[in-house]
Structure formats: structure tokens, C-alpha cells
């Protein structure tokens, strides 16, 4: 008799194929779920494999449009970044995948969900916190945290032996000495040889982005139009055909930015980051589209965003949003509160940025706006007396100097010399 139906996040790889068979051995019915978030994947082959192993159903949900509109573009608006360089490609995909998995679990009458995340990574937290927010009564079956599973499958050999026993087809390719996770925003590489932070990644590891040294000698120019902080149009000249190409749909804009950046060596990083579970981890990332869109967006904000709004956003909204996304706290009251602050900061971010991509570099060529009036070249010009007179600054400095003078007097009274 079945113990009930479980919705398993299935990748088609060795780990989740073994988990699928193991769940069947435990007496569960299993719905194999996959989310299409733009990764390179043979979904038909994954379906065939899951059903052959014994899944009662295979469901693949196309999340690409929702991923861009609901997650990736708001991340561009808020300039999301973790520890200065990581643009959160993996973290940003988790809420959309988790929601799709819970939706499938509900549709298929599953009492539980399951995944193949390890017990030392961030993803187990990101997925499960999302699951519990979206369906508070759901049960999570987490094999890699269950002694009866991880003690039985202590290494890859145990997984391969079990796969052979169950007739699970395993690709006869040499396992690469690192693990990967891919979506349309980026791909990550970690573990294996990368666990030594001083090991230089081999050239053949990088899958998506051309080596900057091998990138074209001819630069690629493009323009990106923003409305209320959202990229709404991307235009470029195809260097091979000399034809102008313009795209406006959110997914098309994102993919065009991705393809152009990848071809020109833009978006590779290699970092050591702090995981939510208080471990340091080395990761290599290819984050082409977010690198281009974020840099263009930051540049346009310099022209169109109020100074005080920008400082408040940068000091509070951006770091907290980025931290919450990294930690898997998307479906929480605090993240809902933070997300509500993004759009009000972006209402004036309207204009066009001209960008050049060249051998790994994103070069801003210029920016303009037809609607916003914060920038007036005559006000800051050295050649014109407009806005305010030079003598007006005397009073401004005098007011600003009041507390500075008191600070200097205090130091003098205490016999403390101000030093560099």
C-alpha cells in the first residue's frame, strides 16, 4: 500500500535518479518535477528516464518568463549584489522553482515534497523555507539529511552500484571535478578541485562565457532603454550581418543581454563567499546578463535618481534585499516589506544607456533621459553663472563648519592632535 504521493525536484542526474528509486523503495508514489529556468537540459530525455525508473508522472513547468519579470528584473532595479560581486544567480532562481514545485504538488495531490540538496549547502534552506511559506502543512523528505540514506550512500560508488541494481541508466562520461547549477541568469561551479581557493579554474570549466582573451577584437555596442528602472528595450547592431536588432519583450531583452555579454567575455567571477550556514565556500560564476544590465542601470541612476533616495536605498533596501535573497527568505514578511520599497525608488529611473562590450569589459559610452530634469549641465558648468552664485557657497560652508570647528576645538582642549 502506498505511503502517499511525493513531488520530487528531479534533475535527471545520478543523485535525484537514485533518490527517485529510493523513495519508491520506501513505498511512496513519486511525481518527478522539473522547472525550466533557462538551463541547458534535455527535458524529453529526463522525462523518459524518470518514468522508466518508476515515477507515476513527470511534470515540467516553464518558468522562464516569470523568472525574468518577477525576480530578475526587480533584482536589476534594486542593484542586488551579495558581498560586493556575486549577483545572486542561484539564489534568485530558488523562489520561482519552489513556487512551481508547490503548485505541482497541490495539483497532483502530493502530501510531501523532496529534493536532492546536500546537508551543507544553502539550497536546502532556500527551498524548504519557501515550501513552508507556500504550503505550511507540507512535509519535506530530505534524503541527504536522513541517516538511513546518507549512511547507505556514502559516496559516488554506492550511488552507481544502486543505479546499476535498479537499472537506472547513467551517462558513461567522466565526472567533472566540480558541481554546477545553471539557469538563464548564470551558471555556478563549486566543490571538487575548486575547494582549494588557490586552484586556478581550468579553461575548459567555463561553459557559457567566452574567455576574455579569446573574445572578438571588434567591440559590441548596444543601447538599453529603461522605464521606471526596468529594462524595456535593447538595441544593437549585429557585427556579422550589420543589421540593427531591437527586442522589447522581457525574456527577449534578458536573453539578448546574455548572448551579447557571453560572446564578448563579460561576467566571469571567482570568489570565496560566506554561506548562510556560517561556512565559507569558494564559487565560480558566469553571470553575463546581470552584469550588463546592472551596470547600465546603476549608471542611469546617477543621472535620474534623487540623491537622498539613492542613499537610503543603497544603505537599507539593497543590502537587506540581497541578504534575504541569499539566505532563502524571499517568502517572508521582512522580504515582502523590503520588496515594497523597490518600485518607489525607481519611478524616476527613465532613460537610455549606451554600452560597449569588449573583451570582458562593460564600458558606458553615455546616458540620456527625455523625462527627468535632475541634471542640468548649466548648473555645474564652470563657464556659466546659473542656479546659484559662487558667493552663495560661503554661507553653506560656514553652516557646515559649525560642528567641525567644535570638533577641532575639543581635540585641541584635550591636547589631542588630529592626524592622518
UniProtKB/Swiss-Prot annotation:
E.C. number: 6.3.4.5
Lineage: Eukaryota, Fungi, Dikarya, Ascomycota, Saccharomycotina
Name of the protein: Argininosuccinate synthase
Main location as per UniProt: cytoplasm
Job description of the protein: Catalyzes the eighth step in arginine biosynthesis. Also has a catabolic function as the first enzyme of citrulline utilization as nitrogen source via arginine and the reactions involved in the arginase pathway.
Subunit architecture: Homotetramer.
Gene Ontology molecular-function annotations: argininosuccinate synthase activity; ATP binding
Misc. comment: Present with 1870 molecules/cell in log phase SD medium.
UniProt keyword Amino-acid biosynthesis present: yes
Activity sensitivity to pH: Optimum pH is 7.5-8.0 for the forward reaction and 6.0-6.5 for the reverse reaction.
Residues that hold ATP according to the record: 9-17, 35, 114-122
Annotated residues for binding of L-aspartate: 118, 122-123
Keyword Acyltransferase: no
GO cellular component, one term: cytoplasm
UniProt xrefs under InterPro entries: Arginosuc_syn_C, Arginosuc_syn_N, Arginosuc_synth, Arginosuc_synth_CS, Arginosuc_synth_type_1_subfam, AS_cat/multimer_dom_body, Rossmann-like_a/b/a_fold
Biological processes annotated in GO: argininosuccinate metabolic process; L-arginine biosynthetic process; urea cycle
SUPFAM superfamilies reported in the protein's UniProt record: Adenine nucleotide alpha hydrolases-like, Argininosuccinate synthetase, C-terminal domain
Pathway of action: Amino-acid biosynthesis; L-arginine biosynthesis; L-arginine from L-ornithine and carbamoyl phosphate: step 2/3
Subcellular location: Cytoplasm
PANTHER family, per the entry: ARGININOSUCCINATE SYNTHASE
